[in-house]
């Protein structure tokens, strides 16, 4: 390398770490590997309207979701997943539809409050993965805007938010298990 080399006498107290087992000499606790994962699910019936609120984005459609809030099924499921991972009550308990202060509320506010709550009790949200099962309207053109909206509300990097869209594809479970159906 071009520099001078010196010989330095070692000291018994200066432990050298050569092998993986030598790390035991440091006597430190390993980092926690506790990762908590939540799962959320939500459905709403349709009513008269001209758009659906999905993941914080107004998607043009010939109907709307019937709900006490704005009916955003994606955000409601996400809130339940976040709260569930922390062992907290679900959004129905924290933001009940019997409380008029939540009538017509923007679901992004519910998400913001859910995130604030889990952070206040010591949790960190690493990433979110949202699956929207929907025949119509077509959701794919809105996925990036949805991910940006969710990331902004949650205060996390956009690339830590994943939006997946799925179809039933004429599955036999469709009549018994519908999330969004025309």
Where would I find each of the regions flagged by the language model?
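Acidic-glycine-rich active-site phosphate/pyrophosphate-binding loop
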Residues: 43-58, 154-160
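C-terminal edge-of-domain segments
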Residues: 171-182
